[in-house]
């Protein structure tokens, strides 16, 4: 994968987020195979498949209840990362060792799903979310975390370096 691909995938998360009907924030997520440079699945935040378009039916329940962004993550729509992971399960696509691109920091609930699913790296645009609990959780659970800026090539270059976890696996005597 090259820097131009990283820029493209990150920009595509922003485009994908435009499909969300959430009135508060719009997130898009892609899960990409770094070996083939192909998108496996995607997701954006919104109501459940076949259900209401918003978490409160025709209104945003988080707005109705005055819930501050970054808190009470169990209330509201399905997040982009969760939708992408669920889509992979629904379609029978393994995402273990793959890279997840999202246009904002994952919340703690999405971080738990990401770590459990076996995602190797999370590449995200900084500033999309008001909490860093999810980032701390991912780091604690050995998921590579890469905040990037489309204007900062050094942040993009760091994504292409092997992580400790990957280096350790590559040097395994059991291969």
Explain the meaning of each model-derived region.
Residues 1-175:
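Zinc-dependent deaminase catalytic domain
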């Amino acid at each position: 994968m090259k820097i131009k691909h990283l820029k493209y995938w990150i920009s595509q998360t922003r485009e994908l987020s435009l499909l969300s009907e959430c009135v508060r924030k719009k997130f898009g997520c892609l899960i990409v195979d770094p070996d083939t440079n192909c998108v496996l699945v995607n997701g954006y935040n919104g109501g459940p498949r076949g259900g209401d378009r918003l978490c409160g039916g025709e209104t945003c329940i988080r707005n109705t209840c005055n819930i501050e962004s970054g808190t009470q993550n169990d209330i509201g729509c399905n997040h982009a990362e969760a939708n992408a992971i669920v889509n992979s399960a629904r379609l029978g696509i393994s995402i273990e060792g793959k890279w997840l691109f999202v246009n904002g920091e994952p919340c703690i609930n999405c971080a738990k799903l990401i770590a459990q699913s076996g995602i190797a790296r999370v590449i995200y645009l900084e500033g999309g979310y008001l909490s860093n609990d999810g980032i701390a959780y991912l780091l604690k659970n050995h998921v590579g975390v890469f905040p990037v800026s489309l204007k900062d090539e050094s942040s993009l270059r760091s994504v292409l370096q092997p992580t400790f976890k990957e280096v350790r696996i590559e040097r395994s005597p059991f291969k």
